Every structure is written in C-alpha cells, then in structure tokens.
C-alpha cells in the first residue's frame, strides 16, 4: 500500500498515525469512529475530529492515488486509502452524513493528478 512521505494537511510533530490496511476496518456508528487495526480497536468520539483532508499522489494508476486523513485530536491521525473497501462508505455514507464535508474539494481531489492536500472539513468552520 502506498504511504505518504509528508502529510502537509495534518499538523507535523510527534503524532500517532493509525493506518487502515486492507484487512482492517473503519466505521462510524452512534457518533463514534471505530478503527479496527489488526486485533486492536480504537474508538474516537466524532466531537474530537479537528480536521479531515484528502491527500492525492502522482503515482496512479498503479498505486492508490488518494487517501483520507482524519485528525482525531490528541496528536492522532487515522489514514485510509481510496481503494480500501471501507473508504467510500465511511466518507460518503457515514461521516459525510453527520459533518459538513466540502464536496467541491472532494471533486477537485478526485480529479487531481498531483501531490496535493485538500481540506474537506475543519471543526467550527
């Protein structure tokens, strides 16, 4: 799975990066985000989300060319790539129904072929 070298849209510094790999899952239920990574479950309140960005690469079509990064506060970010089975449901059917996602930025990111960061949500924006 493609990893991003620098995550410009998420604050730099000592952060915990939780990566949702192919065998893992990411869901939203009852205002809580559930990240199942390996045998570990991470749970975050929806209220803790500071920012959500879409990251694009210039590596398509052989690698995932878009990823979602969710800043859940406490120096923790969750990452999921666009080809993951949970990506579309999480973004459009779950988180997109409860937060004010900037869908114009989602469209721009979807058509981008460069390395770029698109902020699609910021708390109190």
Model-identified regions with their sequence ranges:
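Phosphoinositide-binding peripheral membrane targeting modules
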Residues: 18-20, 25, 29-57
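Acidic, Ser/Thr- and proline-rich intrinsically disordered linker/docking segments
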Residues: 50-125
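Anionic N-terminal interaction surfaces
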Residues: 1-28
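A near-ubiquitous, low-amplitude feature marking generic local secondary-structure context
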Residues: 9-12, 16, 32-35, 74, ...
């Amino acid at each position: 799975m493609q990893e991003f070298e620098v995550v410009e849209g998420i604050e730099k510094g000592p952060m915990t990066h939780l990566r949702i790999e192919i065998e893992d899952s990411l869901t939203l239920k009852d205002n809580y985000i559930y990240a199942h990574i390996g045998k570990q479950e991470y749970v975050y309140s929806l209220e803790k989300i500071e920012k959500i960005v879409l990251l694009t690469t210039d590596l398509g079509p052989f690698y995932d060319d878009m990823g979602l990064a969710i800043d859940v506060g406490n120096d923790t970010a969750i990452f999921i790539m666009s080809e993951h089975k949970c990506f579309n449901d999480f973004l459009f059917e779950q988180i997109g129904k409860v937060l004010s996602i900037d869908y114009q930025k989602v469209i721009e990111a979807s058509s981008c072929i460069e390395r770029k960061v698109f902020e699609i949500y910021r708390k109190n924006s």
